[in-house]
Amino acid sequence: HGLPAQCPNADGTMVHTCCLHGMPTFKLNFDSHFTIKTVVAQNGTELPESILPEATIDRIPPSSHDLESVRGNLVRKNVDRLSLQEVNSLVHALKRMQKDRSSDGFESIACFHALPPLCPNPTAKHRYACCLHGMATFPQWHRLYVVQFEQSLNRHGATVGVPYTDWTYPMKEVPHLLTSEKYTDPFTAVETFNPFNHGHLSLLSPET
């Protein structure tokens, strides 16, 4: 497998390791086409060629194929470490999400978290909040809820995951992304409302 070099035989004038680590000696690469004719064991015994079957190809890959677009997992970053581009993508994604009135929109997902009570269904006589606050299974439920919110943000154009605040570090104020009522796009200089500060929920009030 390695040293000392003993191939093709230990007494040869030009010996090399018996493993394929010595391929450069023969000016071979791993994609070179070659056939092993002689195998010499560590003790110098020459092994017959029949011991190693002829190499075969189990699968011939296609010369070309369609590439399936796959989006990777989103990275969740500390809110204080977001770049201008990342904040910009989050703000515009949340704005689009708030305008979406489908089940993938902000209002539908936000209401599912608490009020108004919509479970077991919106038309039931006795309804309750769909969240599991105060229950032992709340952590598991909330993890899935954050993923649902995050995936919706991504489908609406966010390039990063839901940002977080690191509670292990002292913090003197709430992040500016949440407290500022206005947001100025650093690339267009257009000032609009900040969707992370307030938004529209028709089932509760005009602005929340």
From Swiss-Prot:
Cu cation binds at residues 1, 113, 133, 142. Pfam families: Tyrosinase. There is a cross-link at residues 19-21, 131-133 (2'-(S-cysteinyl)-histidine (Cys-His)). Glycans are attached at residue 43. Decamers of large identical subunits (390 kDa), each containing 8 globular oxygen-binding functional units. Residues 75-208 are annotated as: Unit F. Keywords: Copper, Disulfide bond, Glycoprotein, Metal-binding, Oxygen transport, Repeat, Thioether bond, Transport. Its cofactor is Cu(2+). One of its GO terms (molecular function) is metal ion binding. Binds 2 copper ions per heterodimer. PANTHER family: TYROSINASE FAMILY MEMBER (PTHR11474). Disulfide bonds join 7-18, 119-130. InterPro entries: Di-copper_centre_dom_sf (IPR008922), Tyrosinase/Hemocyanin (IPR050316), Tyrosinase_Cu-bd (IPR002227). Hemocyanins are copper-containing oxygen carriers occurring freely dissolved in the hemolymph of many mollusks and arthropods. Gene3D superfamilies: Di-copper center containing domain from catechol oxidase. Belongs to the tyrosinase family. Hemocyanin subfamily. This is Hemocyanin, units E and F. Residues 1-74 are annotated as: Unit E. The lineage of its organism: Eukaryota, Metazoa, Spiralia, Lophotrochozoa, Mollusca.
